[in-house]
Amino acid sequence: MAHGPRYKVPRRRRREGKTNYYKRYVMVLSGKPRFVVRRTNQYIWVQVIIAKPQGDVTVAAAHSRELVKKYGWLGGTKNTPAAYLTGLLAALRALKAGITYAVLDIGLHRPTRGARVFAALKGALDAGLEIPHSEEVLPEEYRIRGEHIAKYAAMLKEQNPELYEKRFSLYLARGLNPEDLPQHFEEVKNKILEEYREVLEKVKAEAAVEA
């Protein structure tokens, strides 16, 4: 509750942990599209947004549940591989819409090295979207492919089968052995890349001309 004449009640979205208004202000002033990454306890979602006088315009977007519904993803929808694939998908859609450059907007998420928000960034970079960044924050390749999850699952299956079935019940219910997650990741990634093959070829051709 507010106390004192100088106390200012934070704006609603700041109180809800959704918006850092100062960072948003700086990014809007830049005039560049924002590559917005957000996560919940269940999902990852990514949007490419352009600020207009009348309000924000979403140019492209992707949600991790799309991976399940459209691309046959059998793994979790909030982990590092899912974040990467969601970022990849959103970036390809942005490129298709003619957006080639954006600035990263992670809102109030902590910029922890290797975090899921940076896995989404890595997906966008691999798609060909140009986003200023530091290489140090990006997750290592083995984490993006889910090898750490597969290794943990294999260990757990051997040492504690009951806990293994409990921890990976979602994977098993969908018909995926978590030990096979890296291979499954590559399959889904290739599906996405194949769908946007023409976009990727166009980006490569334009890059070759500029070079």
UniProtKB/Swiss-Prot annotation:
GO biological process: ribosomal large subunit assembly; translation
Any one GO CC term of the record: cytosolic large ribosomal subunit
UniProt keyword list: Ribonucleoprotein, Ribosomal protein, RNA-binding, rRNA-binding
Ligase as UniProt keyword: no
GO molecular function: 5S rRNA binding; structural constituent of ribosome
Domain of life per record: Archaea
Keyword RNA-binding set for record: yes
InterPro entries found in the cross-reference section: Rbsml_uL18_euk
Subunit structure: Part of the 50S ribosomal subunit. Contacts the 5S and 23S rRNAs.
Its biological purpose: This is one of the proteins that bind and probably mediate the attachment of the 5S RNA into the large ribosomal subunit, where it forms part of the central protuberance.
PANTHER family in the record: LARGE RIBOSOMAL SUBUNIT PROTEIN UL18, RIBOSOMAL PROTEIN L5-RELATED
Protein family per UniProt: Belongs to the universal ribosomal protein uL18 family.
Name of the protein this chain belongs to: Large ribosomal subunit protein uL18
Taxonomic classification: Archaea, Thermoproteota, Thermoprotei, Desulfurococcales, Pyrodictiaceae
